[in-house]
Amino acid sequence: MKPILTFLTALLFPVLIDLSSAEDLTVYPPVPGLAASEHYKVRVRAVADGAVWQGAFAIQTACKSLENGTDGYFDTLAGWTHTYVNFETAGAVEIEIARANGQPIHSAAAHPQRKASSCSVKNGRAFVRLDQPCLVAVDIDGRMDTQDTGKGYNGPPLHTISIFANPPLRGKPMPDDRGVLYVKPGVIPPSDGPWTTLYFLPGVHDIGLAFPLRANRQYYIPGDAMVYGTLSNRKWGDAHHIRIFGLGTLSG
């Protein structure tokens, strides 16, 4: 999973944003109304004297069982989960990964390996150091590295984790900025009107299928917002100068 902006997607992905601590590190609070990962807990801190650990909200997406032939699920992946965290950093950071159930981690490996300056296990927890913003997956206890999980795999569900250490996002709107229409969770926003920016407030949103995008507009999803639905534009000549950004999640 990568934070790539895409229209009409059926994948869950983190879009690109803000909120919390040290000068070079921005960690987001939990998404109101969204359960944290059942499998992992994550903390992060800047690599600097006196830096303190901050809890990073771990979001989980799960594979369902096959319900019909067109939903894109596979029964062999039922119960698999992926956990991910988003934060912003301008410098080096250290990430701590622990199992949510308190059981110890025995081994860990970051991929791509070249992106992590170190990856180790201490006292049953994994520690990853990143010297600059990057995206890495961390294989816990060799679940993906030491076995073939391709076609024919019939073992227990696997639970993977990724770290999205994004560069600082500039130009974030504020809910009270001129031209900004803020959207509360549970409210379907208007697809048009006297606004230039839709700002999804912290929480869980559902915009339904094919929410219309408009030219010369931007759509902002902060790191503590989850937006379910898809975005589309079917109006000829209206699909230009559209920006979707923030480090929240758009799940189609």
Regions found by a protein language model. Name each.
Residues 6-18:
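Bacterial N-terminal signal peptides
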